[in-house]
Every structure is written in structure tokens, then in C-alpha cells.
């Protein structure tokens, strides 16, 4: 038996057009239609407009039952910068992001394979207008399919070194850097949690969330050119186990 769907979307109160993709297993849900064009004179203003007026769309797409705890996605929209092929506003279960590497790769792949941007066999340059700035990418297309995407991120820099906060009575040192968002980078050798592995992830996650809260209360940050003034992520780094045996 051959089943053929005949869906009249006008019957529904709302309908979103999305394409689900992944980048090496990292999920990225691309929203390509069904939402109003965001208002704003910059991509950051567009992001804030969506956050204020249509955040229920983000939560509906990112949280269960349609999403999951580690869900990522993006709204594709008109760009502000005329150099760009399209605008992009990244999102996850926690809110909106100024930049996301794996979602950039996913967005370019979807845009090409869904016919949202013109493409040809071989190397294609696709430029995205994101809240963090222009993201330039190169996509290799073979037989109409995207084989690979490389990207050049926005300018990255170290913002503040030798910063400290006190968490549960212990002073923790870290560096704040920018790479599309502000990151707090923490050397794990100063901690008592141990090497980074599956067993220690819950402890690092709990500490990271505590640090994120305290950092944004105690340490002001401001991008020199963009309206970005919060630390969005805490990242832990440490020695590679058994690196001499690799």
C-alpha cells in the first residue's frame, strides 16, 4: 500500500518549516519558514527582538517533546550586511547564541541542499550574517551534495587574563576570551575534580554553572564593537591522559 500525505497547513494555528541536520553528530535544527521576519538594524537587535517577542518558538523547537536537552538550532533570515547570503540567529535550550561553529556548518549545508542559496559543483563561498559578525565559509559540493564546510570565524581575542572568583570557598583562576561569544577558560589542574572524562562531567557541569552565574555578577565584560556584554560559556581544559602513549 502506498500512502501519500495531503496536509493542508492552513488548518493549523501555526506551522514552522524546519530542516533537521547534524554536524558529526551535533544536532542543528534549521528554521527556514513560518516565523515573522525579525525586526532590527543589526543582527544582535534581530536576536533580541526574537527573544522578546517569539521566544516561545525557540522553546517549542528546542525542548521536549520536539527537542531534547542538548538541542541546537538556528533561525535563518534576511541579513543586515549586504555581503552576506543570509542571516542566522543561533539558539539552544538555554537561549540565543551569538556564534556557533557546528550550527554554522549545518546552516550552510541546509541552505545549499535545500536550494536557499545558489551553488555549483566544487567550492562555494557562503557568507552568514550572525550576531557576532560575518562568518565566511567554503562549501565543497559534489553531485549536488555538500561534502564539507570550512569556516573563518569572527576575530577572536583574549579579553581579560588572571581573573578569579570564589566558588564554595575556593578561589578559581580563569581567562576570559572572545571567539563569537565570551568564554571563561579554566585550567583543571587547579581543581580537585580530576581529569575530564565521562565520570567527572557532572561535577564540572555543576561547577561551570556556578562560575557562570558569579562571573556575570562580579566581572563586567563588553565587546569593543558589538553589543555583547555577558560571558556565555565556561570551558575547562587539562592535560591529555596518556598523551605519551598516543
What are these language model-derived features?
Residues 2-99, 106-246:
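Active-site proximal loop and beta-alpha junction motif in alpha/beta enzyme cores
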Amino acid at each position: 500500500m502506498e500512502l501519500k500525505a495531503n496536509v493542508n497547513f492552513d488548518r493549523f494555528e501555526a506551522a514552522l518549516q524546519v530542516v533537521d541536520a547534524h554536524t558529526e553528530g551535533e544536532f542543528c535544527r534549521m528554521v527556514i519558514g513560518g516565523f515573522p521576519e525579525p525586526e532590527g538594524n543589526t543582527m544582535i537587535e534581530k536576536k533580541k527582538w526574537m527573544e522578546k517577542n517569539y521566544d516561545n518558538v525557540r522553546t517549542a523547537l528546542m525542548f521536549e517533546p520536539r527537542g531534547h536537552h542538548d538541542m541546537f538550532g538556528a533561525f535563518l533570515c534576511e541579513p543586515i550586511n549586504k555581503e552576506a547570503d543570509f542571516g542566522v540567529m543561533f539558539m539552544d535550550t538555554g537561549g540565543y547564541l551569538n556564534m556557533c561553529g557546528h550550527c554554522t556548518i549545518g546552516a550552510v549545508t541546509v541552505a545549499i541542499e535545500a536550494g536557499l542559496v545558489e551553488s555549483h559543483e566544487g567550492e562555494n563561498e557562503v557568507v552568514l550574517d550572525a550576531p557576532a559578525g560575518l562568518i565566511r565559509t567554503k562549501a565543497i559540493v559534489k553531485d549536488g551534495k555538500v561534502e564539507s564546510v570550512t569556516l573563518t570565524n569572527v576575530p577572536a581575542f583574549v579579553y581579560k587574563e588572571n581573573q578569579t572568583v570564589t566558588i564554595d570557598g575556593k578561589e578559581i583562576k580563569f581567562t576570559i576570551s572572545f571567539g563569537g561569544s565570551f568564554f571563561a577558560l579554566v585550567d583543571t589542574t587547579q581543581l580537585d575534580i580530576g581529569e575530564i572524562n565521562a565520570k567527572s562531567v557532572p561535577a564540572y557541569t555543576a561547577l561551570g554553572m556556578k562560575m557562570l552565574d558569579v562571573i556575570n555578577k562580579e566581572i563586567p565584560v563588553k565587546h569593543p564593537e558589538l553589543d555583547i556584554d555577558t560571558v556565555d560559556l565556561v570551558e575547562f581544559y587539562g592535560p591529555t591522559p596518556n598523551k605519551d602513549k598516543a
